[in-house]
């Protein structure tokens, strides 16, 4: 991902304020509610029958935290996202058979959740930087599919 020095500062400064537990669960939950076909990858998570069940599901929250933990790792290795996400790309491609388009959807949902949590602090410039990052992460996660 090619970020300007200002964009890197914007991304890392905001990320330092992110509650990974809360934002991760909300982002994954929203993905499952807004794009219900993604629920098929989470059938073992129990009740996903309605938005309240999804958003309150402890397994969704726990996995969302795990997802954002990996995203945090990516933010520490912006110059090597493909290497950072190589194993996760392989897992999602070969074993889980996740449609790589879902990585883009989750990235965009994450941007929405960050905007919701940070309001005016999530300026258009910050959003532009985050859109670059989530696109780069989605691309890295889709790498093994090519």
From Swiss-Prot:
Chain positions with S-nitrosocysteine modification? 93
**Residues annotated with Phosphoserine modification:** 44
Q: Which UniProt keywords apply?
A: Acetylation, Heme, Iron, Metal-binding, Oxygen transport, Phosphoprotein, S-nitrosylation, Transport
Q: Which residues carry this modification: N-acetylvaline?
A: 1
Instruction: Extract one GO molecular function annotation from the record.
Output: oxygen carrier activity
A matching Pfam family: Globin
Detail the disulphide connectivity of this chain as listed in its UniProt entry: none
Indicate where the modification N6-acetyllysine is found in the sequence. 59, 82, 144
Coiled coil regions, renumbered to chain: none
Residues annotated as binding heme b are 63, 92
- Modified residue annotations for Phosphothreonine: 12
What does the record give as the function of this protein? Involved in oxygen transport from the lung to the various peripheral tissues.
By sequence similarity, the record places it as follows:
Belongs to the globin family.
What is the protein's given name?
Answer: Hemoglobin subunit beta
Species this chain originates from: Cercocebus atys (Sooty mangabey)
């Amino acid at each position: 991902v090619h970020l300007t020095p200002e964009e890197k500062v914007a991304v890392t400064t905001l990320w330092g304020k992110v509650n990974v537990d809360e934002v991760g669960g909300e982002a994954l939950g929203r993905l499952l509610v807004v794009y219900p076909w993604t629920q098929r990858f989470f059938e073992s998570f129990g009740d996903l029958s309605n938005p309240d069940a999804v958003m309150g599901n402890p397994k969704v929250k726990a996995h969302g935290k795990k997802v954002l933990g990996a995203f945090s790792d990516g933010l520490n290795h912006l110059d090597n996202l493909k290497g950072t996400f190589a194993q996760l790309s392989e897992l999602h491609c070969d074993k889980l058979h996740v449609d790589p388009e879902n990585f883009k959807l989750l990235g965009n949902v994450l941007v929405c959740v960050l905007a919701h949590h940070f309001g005016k602090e999530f300026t258009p410039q910050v959003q532009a930087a985050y859109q670059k990052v989530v696109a780069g992460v989605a691309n890295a996660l889709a790498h093994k599919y090519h």
